[in-house]
Amino acid sequence: NGVQKDFEASVKWYTLAADSGNEWAQNKLANCYYYGDGVEQDEQKAVEYFTKAANVGNKNSMNRLGDCFYYGRGANQDYALAFEWYSKAAEAGHHIAKFNVGNCYYNGYGVDQDFAKAVEWYQQAAEQNIEGAFNKLGDCYSNGYGVDQDFETAMSWYLKAAEKGN
């Protein structure tokens, strides 16, 4: 758009808005700290701001907070908390969180392994064009995980993934 990005100025304004309770700014500021855009990278501070925004309903922060707990970035790795935040984000309609909930069920991370539930969540993510869900559904149908084994259906999911470049 012809405008040069000034992350340091952005951080200044995000901080003012975030500290006054603006959940959108809290999420943006958290991302700045998470990636080190305009500030020194500080994943713990990112978790702090993701938590503030998530607690008032920001579904992007809910999903990102799930990532922080899943991967142990800025917080101790805790699959149960990751699953909890992914689930909240997914229930709020976050498309990637639906895929993440599916992965938790598929792998048994933070929740009992349940391939049928994984398939349900992968299907919801696939309906929103999450490419990874196409692949995972292909795997589920190919191996009979949570569904009857069906190589034709598996191949159709793998083809959808390939068409998306996955």
Model-derived segments and spans:
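Hydrophobic face of amphipathic alpha-helices that form TPR/SEL1-like repeat modules
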Residues: 28-35, 64-71, 100-107, 134-143
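Short helix-capping/linker turns of helical repeat alpha-solenoids
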Residues: 1, 19-23, 35-37, 42, ...
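Low-complexity/repetitive intrinsically disordered segments
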Residues: 1-5, 9-12, 16, 159-166
